[in-house]
């Protein structure tokens, strides 16, 4: 079953699903802006198109991830994103 989610006044939208090949996940698009997300469990984020400038927990330097690149976020933490152009992503819940 698909589950639609909307965050930050509609600037981030995602569709959650469960797949036998990758497990529980969501795909979505982020409009330009700055966002802070909290995690309940570890997440693996793959940039599908565009780019995300990311500040991960415990780090002091922002890093840019582009299409095809992956980063991991620990559970029970926050991470910060800067988005300069509409960017799509795949989030796997680990």
Swiss-Prot record:
Function: Catalyzes the phosphorolysis of diverse nucleosides, yielding D-ribose 1-phosphate and the respective free bases. Can use uridine, adenosine, guanosine, cytidine, thymidine, inosine and xanthosine as substrates. Also catalyzes the reverse reactions.
Alphabetized UniProt keyword annotations: Glycosyltransferase, Transferase
Pfam families: Ppnp
UniProt similarity note: Belongs to the nucleoside phosphorylase PpnP family.
Record InterPro entries: Ppnp, RmlC-like_jellyroll, RmlC_Cupin_sf
Lineage: Bacteria, Pseudomonadati, Pseudomonadota, Gammaproteobacteria, Enterobacterales
Sections of the chain in a coiled coil: none
Protein name per UniProt: Pyrimidine/purine nucleoside phosphorylase
Gene3D superfamilies: Jelly Rolls
One example GO MF annotation: guanosine phosphorylase activity
EC identifiers of the protein: 2.4.2.1, 2.4.2.2
Signal peptide limits: none
Reaction equation(s) it catalyzes: a purine D-ribonucleoside + phosphate = a purine nucleobase + alpha-D-ribose 1-phosphate; adenosine + phosphate = alpha-D-ribose 1-phosphate + adenine; cytidine + phosphate = cytosine + alpha-D-ribose 1-phosphate; guanosine + phosphate = alpha-D-ribose 1-phosphate + guanine
GO CC aspect terms: cytosol
């Amino acid at each position: 079953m698909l589950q639609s989610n909307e965050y930050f006044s509609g600037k981030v939208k995602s569709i959650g699903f469960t797949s036998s090949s990758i497990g529980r996940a969501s795909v979505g698009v982020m409009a330009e802006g700055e966002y802070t997300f909290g995690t309940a469990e570890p997440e693996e984020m793959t940039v599908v198109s565009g780019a995300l400038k990311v500040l991960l927990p415990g780090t002091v330097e922002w890093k840019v991830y582009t299409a095809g690149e992956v980063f991991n976020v620990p559970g029970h933490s926050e991470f910060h994103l800067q988005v300069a152009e509409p960017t799509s992503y795949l989030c796997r819940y680990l």
